[in-house]
Amino acid sequence: MARENSVMLVGRISNPSVTHSEGSESSTLTFSLAVLRRNKRIDYPRVAVYGVEKSKAYELYEQMKRKPMAIVKGVIETTLSSKTVVCPICGGKTKVPRLFTRVVATGIPFVLRENYTPSDFAEVSNNVKLLGEVCTRLQSRNGCTLYQLNVDRSFRIGNVPDDERHDRPWIKSFGSIGEEDAWRLSPGSVVYISGALQTRHVDRMVKCTNPCCEGEIKYPELYHEVITSRVEYLHNCDFAQEGYFDVRDSSDDCFEVFSSPEESEAMY
């Protein structure tokens, strides 16, 4: 099957860091990127740049400490992992699953030397294109639809075997697109998506695993999800009412339904 997993971001760099692997001649750069979209929302995706020659990595790091604007071309990477949280009552440790998501740059970020601001690039600052298969049950309510997409990775990251080169980002659609997604899509549907990468902080709750404690642990989670602006229905979709829905760009009004991330999360 054809592959598409591409991200183009323009924003202001913050919190850069450099790490080295023992015995390797290359380094990894990581940083956050403050991206302003045309709906005035600011997102903070995490970005990684692998395989940077050590001297070049330190040169870039010194530039990034000044918080410049930069252009990043990359792919969305998702990794299943876990994190440990501590119970405030008994001090016991509990492992919770997480889907770690970030953007992996496919080249060295282009650091802008001019005195630009995020608003100068709001129209073109955040663009995502994905081709993949719906791999979870759809959750839909009030014109908002949420699902995960299984995307074949075309860019090799590390020594990952070919049969494991998949990413599964969360997809969220609103308005007429959300309604049409709910009607046409089911697990196994293949779609081509254009949209923007959104980040939001959510407070999660989990019960302590200590059998002598019934406490609840509250912990923060940073979510990355793709907000669709257009969906093309390619295969295994319900085409029974072709043309019934008004397919349009939902990016301008998709945040009018929920005034805050907490309100949006409450529907699930």
Predicted feature locations:
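OB-fold and OB-like beta-barrel modules that bind single-stranded nucleic acids
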Residues: 6-15, 66-78, 128-135, 187-198
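Generic short beta-strand segments
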Residues: 16, 30-34, 74-82, 150-154, ...
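Short phosphate/oxyanion-binding micro-motifs
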Residues: 46-51
